[in-house]
């Protein structure tokens, strides 16, 4: 997800997005632990998306 798309969302939408990304990250970590994850790059993508959302949230809070 692009930062420009995230900046257009409200704070509540961003918090919802963050929660869903954290759940996705947890699921991917469990798949990795049980050797079921084929695309390990998905973990990196989700981690970066989480960082983007948290950055935008802190920008909006300031």
Curated annotation (Swiss-Prot):
Gene that this polypeptide is encoded by: rpmC
Signal peptide start and end residues? none
One example of a Gene Ontology biological process annotation: translation
Record-stated family = Belongs to the universal ribosomal protein uL29 family.
Question: Which InterPro entries does the entry link to?
Answer: Ribosomal_protein_uL29, Ribosomal_uL29, Ribosomal_uL29_CS, Ribosomal_uL29_sf
Mind telling me which Gene3D superfamilies this protein's record contains? 1.10.287.310
What molecular functions are annotated in GO for this chain?
structural constituent of ribosome
* Xref: PANTHER family: 60S RIBOSOMAL PROTEIN L35/50S RIBOSOMAL PROTEIN L29, LARGE RIBOSOMAL SUBUNIT PROTEIN UL29C
Q: Which GO terms describe its cellular component?
A: cytosolic large ribosomal subunit
- Decide whether keyword Flavoprotein is in the record: no
| Name by which UniProt lists this protein | Large ribosomal subunit protein uL29
Reading the lineage from the top rank, the first entry is Bacteria
Stretches assigned to coiled coil:
none
Listed A to Z, the keywords are:
Ribonucleoprotein, Ribosomal protein
Q: What is the lineage of its organism?
A: Bacteria, Pseudomonadati, Pseudomonadota, Betaproteobacteria, Neisseriales
């Amino acid at each position: 997800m692009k930062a420009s798309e995230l900046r257009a969302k409200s704070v509540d939408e961003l918090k919802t997005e963050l929660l869903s990304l954290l759940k996705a990250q947890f699921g991917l970590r469990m798949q990795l632990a049980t050797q079921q994850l084929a695309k390990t790059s998905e973990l990196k993508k989700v981690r970066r998306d989480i960082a983007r959302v948290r950055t935008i949230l802190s920008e909006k809070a300031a």
